[in-house]
Amino acid sequence: MANKQDLIAKVAAATELTKKDSAAAVDAVFAAVTEYLSKGEKVQLIGFGNFEVRERAARKGRNPQTGKETKIAASKVPAFKAGKALKDAVK
């Protein structure tokens, strides 16, 4: 499994940037995606995939310790849908 540091190292090697500059670039991309999603906007990266905010409806839940039924409020969650090129690369 790759982590953020592995991603930074890969970006540094591919772009000939320093690891410090690569880390700044990776952080900037993550921050931009987060900012767009927090505003409810979709981020579409052709060939890679789409990041979007999906709404979860309110639903009934159950406390596993007591078995008591409870209401879970509606919420918004980030979601990612892989694009065709990414799906094909994974096959």
UniProtKB/Swiss-Prot annotation:
Keywords from the named record: DNA condensation, DNA-binding, Virulence
GO biological process: chromosome condensation
One term of GO molecular function: structural constituent of chromatin
GO cellular component terms attached to this protein's record: cytosol
SMART domains tied to this protein: BHL
Keyword Cytoplasm: no
Domain of life of the source: Bacteria
Matches recorded under Pfam families: Bac_DNA_binding (PF00216)
Keyword DNA-binding annotated: yes
CDD domains from the UniProt entry: HU
Family: Belongs to the bacterial histone-like protein family.
Purpose of the protein: Histone-like DNA-binding protein which is capable of wrapping DNA to stabilize it, and thus to prevent its denaturation under extreme environmental conditions. Also seems to act as a fortuitous virulence factor in delayed sequelae by binding to heparan sulfate-proteoglycans in the extracellular matrix of target organs and acting as a nidus for in situ immune complex formation.
Protein name: DNA-binding protein HU
